[in-house]
């Protein structure tokens, strides 16, 4: 078991948060990680942050982790996608670089179900037609 003193001497893993995440999500990381932020949609800023040496990067939809970004990342071990799809991650390039890619495939199940129920209720009550009539002044 690692003592508190030994843990303080060990460098914390560096996590790059490349897009805005909720404070609760960032809070989960706590003080166990060295957290850095960048604008993942800004290509130059992303590449510079990746070149600085990070262990993990947290992304959403706007950040493109293609072969160039993966190649620029020194020491990167994990690409974590806060969301369902992985279309913005070059999986073959990450695999070749031995980088673990993870996502949250069930993160929007409740929201999707709520939206489906709301659409069914709107359809049952003819809300789209009523809205159109109201806007037309009828």
Language-model features and meaning:
Residues 2-102:
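An N-terminal-biased, well-structured beta-alpha scaffold segment characteristic
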Residues 97, 105-138:
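Phosphate-binding beta-alpha-beta segment of Rossmann-like dinucleotide-binding domains, i.e.
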